[in-house]
Swiss-Prot record:
Organism per entry: Cereibacter sphaeroides (strain ATCC 17023 / DSM 158 / JCM 6121 / CCUG 31486 / LMG 2827 / NBRC 12203 / NCIMB 8253 / ATH 2.4.1.) (Rhodobacter sphaeroides)
Gene3D superfamilies in alphabetical order: 2.20.25.10
Pfam families attached to this UniProt entry: Trm112p (PF03966)
InterPro entries, per the entry: Trm112-like (IPR005651)
Protein name: UPF0434 protein RHOS4_00640
GO cellular component, one term: cytosol
Similarity-based family: Belongs to the UPF0434 family.
Length: 59
């Protein structure tokens, strides 16, 4: 396995924003899940989305 684990896009079907419960968009370049309604970007580390508001980046 390489140093980067890819995010499985099928997870987007089950994941929602923890703030708004709205759907998320995947930013492959930045390895983030984007909540447009909450204006937050949740990081993906080693293929695992970190869905903690405290870890999110404000947009």
């Amino acid at each position: 396995m390489t140093g980067t684990t890819l995010f499985d896009r099928r997870m987007l079907e089950a994941l929602v924003c923890p703030v708004t419960q709205a759907g998320l968009a995947y930013d492959a370049d930045r390895q983030e899940l984007i909540s447009k309604q909450a204006r937050l970007a949740f990081p993906i580390r080693d293929g695992i989305p970190i869905m903690l508001v405290s870890e999110a980046r404000e947009l």
